[in-house]
Design a protein with these regions (language model features):
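Short glycine/threonine-rich loop-to-helix capping motif typified by GTGT followed
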Residues: 377, 403-407
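Thr-Gly-centered strand-to-loop micro-motif
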Residues: 365-366, 393, 423, 442-443
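N-terminal localization/anchoring segments of enzymes in phospholipid and broader phosphate metabolism
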Residues: 1-349, 353, 357, 381, ...
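Catalytic-core elements of nucleic-acid end-processing and repair enzymes
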Residues: 431
Length: 511
C-alpha cells in the first residue's frame, strides 16, 4: 500500500498523467480536424508545402531536415502542427539570455594566456587552431599546470571523490543529471556534505528536473536547504507539453575549493559504481583535475547555477581560486561546455577534430551511437586515410530502442573500414575519444543527437598530458573484454529488431 501511495504522489506519476491528458486532447483535436472538411485538409496541405520549403532553406543539419520533411509529408496535419509547436518554442529564451549574460560577466576571469597558446603551437601546430576554437566557444581557456587523474571505473572515482570532499575548506559545488536519494553513493556523499556545512563550508547542489524525476522525491531541494545545503533544480518538470523541457542539464561536475574538479559519465546512483547490477557490469569513466584548469569547471557550474537569477553573481572569487593550486606537469587541458543555445556544436566539433587530425588511430567509447551524416563521413574518411577507427559499444543496453537504432549504423560503418566492438560483460556508459596517444576527450557527451545538439554538456580536451596514455591503456583493456562485430554478425541480428531500428531511425533526431 505504501508503494502505491508513493507512486500516486510521485513527481513522475503526476507529470505522466498530466502529459497523457494533453496528448489525448491533441490527438482528439487532430482526428476532429482531419474529418471536419475538405477545406481544412486542403489548407493543411498548403501549410505542409510551405513548411517543407521553409525547412529545406533553413541552416540546419541535413538529417534534422529530412526527419521533419518526412514527418510533415507522411502525416500532413499532425506533422505540420507538431512542427509549428516545436519550432515556435525552440530553446527557452529566458535561460538563453541568463546563461549568456553570466558567461559574458565571467569572461574577465577566464582570459586566455597567450603563452599557453604559443606552447600549444610549438607542441602541435595542428591543434593550435582547435585550441583557440575551444577557448572561444567552449567557455574556458586552455590551461597548463594541471594534473589529470583518469578513472577507468566508477568505483575508484567515487572513493577519490569522497577523499577530496573531506578536504573541503571553502566551497563544494555539485551538478549532476541524476542523483538517487536511496543509493549508498548519494547517502555517503550527503553525510560528508552535512558535516562540511557544520564546519562552515559553502555547499551548493544542482540537479536536473528530468534526470531526477524518478530518483528524488518531490521537494527534495527543500529538504537539502533545511540541511544548510543550497540547492537548485535545473528546469523542473512542469506537466505541460513544451519543447523547453527537451533541453536537459546532462553535466556531471564536482568542484572542491577550486582545487579539484571531477567530471565524466558517472552520476550519483549505485549502478555507476557497480553497487547495484542493472545491465551487467557498468563500465564508466571519468577524471579528476587538480590545478589551474579547475577554474573552467567552476565557471561552468556557476553559469548554470545563475540561470533565472535576477542579479548576476560575482563569481570571480570562486573562479580565480584555482590559481593558487597550480600543479607543475606536462601537457594542456581545456575544459569545455556545450549548450543548445546557439548553433555552435562544440562537443561534436571536438570529436570530429580527433577524427580529422588523426594519423594513426582514433578510439571511441560511447553508450549510444546515433550519428548524423557529417559525423559518419568524418569516421569514413578517417578510415579511408588508413586511420585505425575503433568504437566500443554496450552489449547489454540500458535502452533497447537506442541499441536497435545504433545497430542500424553498423553495416555502413563496417563497410567503411571502421571496427565495432560490444562490451560483453555489460553496459558501457563511458563517453570518450582518444587519438594518436596525444589527444583525448572525456566527459558527458554521447555520440547521439541529444548530447550533440540538445543538452547542456561538459568535458575536457587533453593534449599531451600523461593521463592520455592511461586512457589508451584502458581502451585496449576494455577491447580485450569486447566482442568484435562483423558483417556476418550483422546479417544474423534479429530481423524484427532490425526493422524496428530502421523505423526509429526515421525520427532519430527527435528522440
Amino acid at each position: 500500500m505504501k508503494k502505491i501511495y508513493r507512486l500516486l504522489y510521485s513527481n513522475k506519476f503526476v507529470a505522466m498523467v498530466m502529459l497523457l491528458m494533453q496528448i489525448i486532447t491533441f490527438v482528439a483535436m487532430y482526428i476532429w480536424i482531419s474529418d471536419y472538411s475538405k477545406v481544412l485538409f486542403g489548407l493543411s496541405t498548403v501549410l505542409s508545402a510551405v513548411l517543407i520549403i521553409f525547412e529545406i532553406n533553413r541552416t540546419e543539419e541535413s538529417t534534422f531536415k529530412m526527419t521533419w520533411i518526412t514527418l510533415i509529408a507522411i502525416i500532413p496535419i499532425f506533422g505540420a502542427l507538431f512542427y509549428l509547436f516545436t519550432r515556435a518554442q525552440g530553446v527557452s529564451m529566458n535561460i538563453g539570455d541568463d546563461y549568456k549574460n553570466i558567461q559574458e560577466a565571467n569572461k574577465k576571469y577566464l582570459v586566455q594566456d597567450e603563452d599557453v597558446m604559443k606552447n600549444i603551437y610549438q607542441t602541435d601546430k595542428n591543434q593550435d587552431g582547435f585550441a583557440r576554437y575551444l577557448s572561444k566557444y567552449g567557455g574556458s581557456p586552455a590551461y597548463t599546470n594541471t594534473g589529470v587523474q583518469y578513472y577507468s571505473i566508477g568505483e575508484r572515482m567515487f572513493e577519490d571523490m569522497k577523499k577530496e570532499l573531506l578536504k573541503a575548506e571553502k566551497f563544494i559545488f555539485l551538478e549532476f543529471f541524476i542523483i538517487n536519494h536511496t543509493s549508498r553513493m548519494w547517502n555517503e556523499i550527503l553525510e560528508i556534505l552535512k558535516k562540511k556545512v557544520k564546519q562552515g563550508v559553502e555547499v551548493r547542489v544542482m540537479y536536473d528536473g528530468m534526470g531526477c524525476i524518478a530518483t528524488l522525491p518531490r521537494k527534495y531541494n527543500e529538504y537539502l536547504e533545511r540541511q544548510g545545503i543550497k540547492c537548485r533544480i535545473f528546469s523542473p518538470i512542469v506537466p505541460l507539453l513544451s519543447t523547453h523541457q527537451n533541453n536537459r542539464d546532462h553535466r556531471k561536475i564536482m568542484v572542491i575549493d577550486g582545487a579539484t574538479a571531477f567530471c565524466g559519465g558517472i552520476n550519483i546512483s549505485d549502478e555507476y559504481i557497480n553497487e547495484k547490477m542493472r545491465f551487467g557490469h557498468w563500465k564508466d569513466t571519468g577524471f579528476m583535475l587538480r590545478g589551474e584548469a579547475v577554474a573552467g569547471f567552476t565557471a561552468m557550474f556557476l553559469e548554470m547555477w545563475n540561470v533565472n537569477d535576477e542579479h548576476i553573481e560575482n563569481c570571480g572569487e570562486y573562479i580565480q581560486a584555482s590559481k593558487k593550486y597550480s600543479v607543475s606537469t606536462d601537457g594542456f587541458v581545456i575544459p569545455f561546455g556545450d549548450t543548445p543555445l546557439d548553433e555552435v556544436y562544440v562537443g561534436k566539433r571536438a570529436y570530429i577534430n580527433n577524427l580529422n587530425n588523426a594519423s594513426e588511430y582514433t578510439y571511441i567509447m560511447t553508450p549510444y551511437l546515433v550519428i548524423d551524416d557529417e559525423m559518419y563521413e568524418c569516421m569514413k574518411y578517417a578510415a579511408q586515410r588508413g586511420v585505425d577507427v575503433k568504437i566500443i559499444m554496450p552489449h547489454i543496453p540500458d535502452k533497447k530502442y537506442a541499441f536497435y537504432l545504433a545497430r542500424t549504423y553498423y553495416k555502413e560503418l563496417l563497410k567503411a573500414g571502421i571496427e565495432i566492438y560490444e562490451y560483453t560483460p555489460g553496459f558501457v556508459h563511458a563517453k570518450m575519444s582518444i587519438s594518436d596517444g596525444k589527444k583525448a576527450i572525456v566527459g558527458t557527451v554521447n555520440h547521439d543527437y541529444r548530447s550533440l545538439y540538445l543538452h547542456y554538456e561538459c568535458a575536457a580536451y587533453m593534449l599531451n598530458v600523461p593521463a592520455v596514455m592511461d586512457i589508451e591503456r584502458d581502451f585496449k583493456d576494455t577491447l580485450e573484454l569486447s566482442q568484435k562485430i562483423t558483417l556476418e554478425d550483422v546479417k544474423h541480428f534479429n530481423i524484427f529488431t532490425k526493422i524496428l531500428g530502421h523505423i526509429i531511425r526515421l525520427v532519430a533526431p527527435l528522440l
